[in-house]
A protein has these predicted regions:
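Active-site activation/catalytic loop segments of kinase-like enzymes and analogous catalytic loops
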Residues: 279-307, 320-338, 345-348
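An alpha-helical support segment within catalytic cores of ATP-dependent transferases
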Residues: 77-96, 201-250, 254-260, 351
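Active-site acidic catalytic loop and adjacent metal/ATP-binding pocket
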Residues: 106-119, 123-124, 235-279
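All-alpha amphipathic helical-bundle segments outside canonical DNA-binding/catalytic cores
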Residues: 309-319
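Low-acidity, Ser/Thr- and Arg-rich intrinsically disordered low-complexity segments
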Residues: 2, 6, 16, 22, ...
């Protein structure tokens, strides 16, 4: 039995409304796949079979401009692999697939599952292909420190060699970007960040937005190369302004804020490190589209105490750095990612507007 997991959608254009009821991938042999699209019309599809090394499937389909064009990348996991992980870490002794219920959780970098077995529920994280970017030993250290300080929820297993993490399943509410429009929820998020930044925690250095763009930019790509040059200008300007050193989370998209027992916590500390708290706030604003609402943006800046001209300048420069960081990261994962290209284009334009 296989679990087919959507990893990314590179491109989607809907010309007319259409309903895709489901996509079923069937295996006849390990290297042969077919796709059945159950919808109003049938479109031709091609599938690149996964290699044993990557175990990835690329599905491409087009409707000759009449309905929908998409490119989908899917990861393939055997159910038996999930079970093997649970056996290896002594979470369960059951080898019977019928005893397991496994469902996918939405994620960006990693693949995560809710796994039910032995009348218990767990969350299993299987890391993505990013060993060159994330130091799992540092992530474990920083997660443990954050847990001790009451900033996150506990885990059962964290293997720093593989990046596999297993936690008990908690009945939580996961923030959406729209939740930051709610003043109470927004301030709860700010409070947990302030608690982190004002703590005496010392994180191990792991992921630095001041350097990562240099490592992941594909200089053969013109927009990535230009974004890299903008990154150097940003770092030069920030060094002139002054960079502080605080424990930071550094990946503040909405899904990393959760509510549990009426308290707000942060999860997923894989990019955490010592850094400047302005990057955390700038990253939070950009990843959750605060710039779409000028009133919300101004209110939120006042709430985090950023109001002076020099403070706003530093904040906005860190916002550009956030765009470059995650724009390049999106293109590293998927070279045709439209959001990544938009983020880099915006960062380049803002840099020119500021004459950095």
């Amino acid at each position: 039995m296989y679990l087919f997991i959507r990893d990314a959608i590179d491109h989607i254009v809907i010309i007319k409304p259409t309903t895709v009821k489901n996509i079923v991938l069937c295996t006849y042999m390990f290297s042969l796949f077919s796709v059945l699209l159950k919808k109003a019309a049938r479109f031709p599809a091609t599938i690149a079979a996964p290699t044993p090394r990557s175990r990835r499937i690329i599905v491409k389909s087009s409707a000759n401009g009449s309905f929908i064009t998409y490119i989908m990348i899917m990861n393939m996991f055997k159910t038996s692999e999930v079970i093997e992980i649970f056996l290896n870490y002594d979470i369960s002794k059951s080898k019977d697939e019928s005893k397991y219920e496994i469902s996918e959780l939405e994620g960006i970098t990693n693949t995560s599952f809710v796994v039910s077995v032995d009348n218990k529920k767990f969350v299993l994280r299987i890391p993505g292909n990013n060993p060159d970017v994330i130091n799992r030993l540092s992530e474990k250290h920083n997660s443990t420190k954050a847990l001790e300080y009451g900033l996150t929820i506990p885990y059962l297993i964290f293997d720093e060699n593989t990046g596999i993490k297993i936690s008990r399943y908690f009945d939580i509410y996961t923030y959406k970007a729209s939740d930051f429009k709610n003043e109470n929820m927004r301030n709860n998020a700010f409070n947990v960040l302030n608690k982190l930044h004002n703590s005496d925690l010392v994180f191990q250095n792991n992921f630095s937005p001041l350097r990562i763009f240099q490592e992941i930019a594909d200089t053969s790509n013109s927009i990535e190369n230009e974004a890299k040059e903008v990154g150097f200008k940003i770092v030069k300007k920030l060094n002139e302004i002054g960079i502080s050193n605080h424990p930071c989370h550094q990946d503040l998209y909405s899904g990393n804020f959760i509510l549990y027992n009426d308290e707000t916590y942060l999860i997923d500390w894989e990019y955490s490190s010592m850094g400047d708290k302005y990057f955390d706030f700038a990253d939070l604003f950009w990843q959750n589209e605060f710039d779409f609402d000028k009133n919300l943006r101004k209110e939120a800046l006042d709430e985090i105490g950023i109001s002076k001209k020099d403070e706003i300048e530093k904040f906005e420069i860190f916002e550009i750095l956030s765009m470059i960081t995650w724009g390049l990261w999106a293109l590293k994962r998927s070279p045709n990612d439209n959001d990544g290209q938009v983020a880099l284009s915006k960062a380049i334009k803002l840099c020119k507007d500021k004459k950095l």
